[in-house]
Amino acid sequence: MIERFQGDEGRRRLVATLTEHRLVANRQELAERLVAVGELMEAPAGTTFINQGDQTSEVFFIIAGKVEVRVNGKVVANRFPGDSVGEMAAIEPSQPRAASVIPVEDTVLIKVSEAEFSAAAEQFPDVWRRIAATLARRLAERNHLVTAQRERVRVFIMSSVEALPIVDLLIKQFAHDPFLAVAWKNGVFRASQYTLDELEAELDDSDFAVAVAHGDDVLITRDDEWPTIRDNVILEFGLFMGRLGRRRAFLMEPRDVDLKLPSDLAGLTTIPYRYVKGKDAEHYIAPACARLRELILAAGAKD
């Protein structure tokens, strides 16, 4: 691809392409100067030419191809011919690179040193204004990717109807903690409107998930009877564990009941609890709540 921009004819094509870039803004003299001082290079797909955290300071003009901009490994933007990357280094060369840039496909670039770029911008001062406008636009793009910080961490607690007294105890135990514990019965799922859409919305809003296991049903295996969890609780917990990960999805199981758990939950760290009806119920379940509180506070809000 780079051959198209080499030689006399290629140089003419290169100047014409660069003239249309946003920062150049149809100034052929500026385009010719950047071509003269810059290095024409080809970056194969998948090769990083700007690394986040590096102290390099070159500015790159995309002539052909497509690149991804990644921050902490996450793709935050794509850039195309007509765009440039690395301009922040021209404004403050002492700062490390704020993002990595990786070609999605074979890409042709013009690399211009910070010194040469700054000298060209001094000759054409409106370049600085265009850089400011470009960075303002990109900041607005980045803001769309930032999730508003909730005032409190949100913990979603799910259970069967039979286990609701246990859930009530958990909600009471966490009433004064710096996180919000929400039970499925409290306006999350309405019996007449139980849909996966509602469940998905709760997945997005929650930082942690807690499933209270209870011997609701009996499973007969090889003539043996085992207490087991309701299928809907397993479904809900599986979805939360898939979205939040094992560090943010906790299964509470009764200490004195040998529950038959699905094989998919094998190896999951569980929190045993004791539930004894009566005036001492809170005291019996307090150790399990203390362990759960410790895990939640240690992990904090999700990213």
From Swiss-Prot:
GO CC annotation: cytoplasm
Keywords: Antiviral defense, Cytoplasm, Hydrolase, Nucleotide-binding
Domain of life per record: Bacteria
GO biological process, one term: defense response to virus
Chief localisation class: cytoplasm
Renumbered residue ranges of the record's region TIR-like: 154-273
MF terms in GO: NADP+ nucleosidase activity; nucleotide binding
Protein residues bound to a nucleoside 3',5'-cyclic phosphate: 14-138
Cellular localisation: Cytoplasm
Enzyme Commission number(s): 3.2.2.5
Catalytic activity, as annotated: NAD(+) + H2O = ADP-D-ribose + nicotinamide + H(+)
Segments forming a coiled coil: none
Enzyme class: hydrolase
Domain comment, as recorded: Has an N-terminal cyclic nucleotide-binding domain and a C-terminal Toll/interleukin-1 receptor-like domain (TIR) that probably has the NAD(+) hydrolase activity.
Role: Pycsar (pyrimidine cyclase system for antiphage resistance) provides immunity against bacteriophage. The pyrimidine cyclase (PycC) synthesizes cyclic nucleotides in response to infection; these serve as specific second messenger signals. The signals activate the adjacent effector, leading to bacterial cell death and abortive phage infection. A clade B Pycsar system. The effector gene of a two-gene Pycsar system. Expression of this and adjacent uridylate cyclase XpPycC (AC P0DV28) confers resistance to bacteriophage T7. When cells expressing the Pycsar system are infected by phage T7 at low multiplicity of infection (0.2 MOI) the culture survivey, at 2.0 MOI bacteria enter growth arrest. The same cells enter growth arrest after exposure to 2.5 mM cUMP but not cCMP; the effector protein responds only to the cUMP usually produced by its cognate NTP cyclase.
Annotated protein name in UniProt: Pycsar effector protein XpPycTIR
Upper lineage: Bacteria, Pseudomonadati, Pseudomonadota, Gammaproteobacteria, Lysobacterales
Encoding gene per record: pycTIR
